[in-house]
């Protein structure tokens, strides 16, 4: 695949003054990839893949991944995998506004995961447990350099955690599900929570679809220390969301959605409060 992205930005004073150019940059990204899957024996499957990414500014990046899947008795599945991930710096981070730094390098990480899942009661009940470890580096963060903010590549991160999820189909109309995740961070990461718990329900009957869920988030870092500067700030909050839709005709459905219905005050990034209770409605037409 091939991507070409970028453009020109400027400030135009409202008093009719001269236009102030900000950035005029175009980047190119080209990649090729191959995926491979082989069933070695009836109960064992091997997956592998590799992607070669070429960025016009940053250079070339190899992105491999591999894993094994074990099909066990009683509809149990065990998976083990390792994969590399990366993120190129954006044009904004490289060139735009005061924190820009054209010398940024890509963020890189390796993730290792062990996952177990099972289906029971003819598929009505399913559950899974995952444990993972992440080893990364070159995270892009904004830090003070010579008295002014600048985007820089910071040090390594080592995170480990676990996830548990379950779903149960009560009947033809009702399904409930829940999940919990725990994240241990050797070095706290911005916008990452230590604990996240969710419980939800789905009702489907005739022309109606209604879903709702409550999510509890604890220890979400809205601000972190970088190079010994700044402070650690965390948020705890509960969110309740609801969505309902009614199919009025084959080609027409009406929907309403409510988010943060408990009107919680919270932030994901320090200094940027999230909306309180929000309600939206609309129609979908299919021809």
Question: Where do the model's predicted regions map?
Answer:
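Face-selective signature of the C-terminal outer-membrane beta-barrel domain
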Residues: 1-58, 71, 125-131, 177
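Transmembrane beta-strands of outer-membrane beta-barrel pores
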Residues: 2, 9-15, 30, 50-56, ...
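Transmembrane beta-strands of outer-membrane beta-barrel proteins
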Residues: 3-7, 46-48, 64, 78-80, ...
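Residues that define the transmembrane beta-barrel architecture of outer-membrane proteins
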Residues: 26-30, 60-62, 108-112, 156-160, ...
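Residue-level signature of outer-membrane beta-barrel architecture
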Residues: 37-38, 52, 60, 70-71, ...
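Gram-negative outer-membrane beta-barrel transporters
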Residues: 39-45, 131-135, 152-223, 253-254, ...
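Outer-membrane beta-barrel signature, preferentially recognizing the C-terminal barrel domain
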Residues: 77, 81-137, 143-169, 189-195, ...
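C-terminal beta-signal and adjacent terminal beta-strands/loops
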Residues: 135-137, 216-225, 242-287
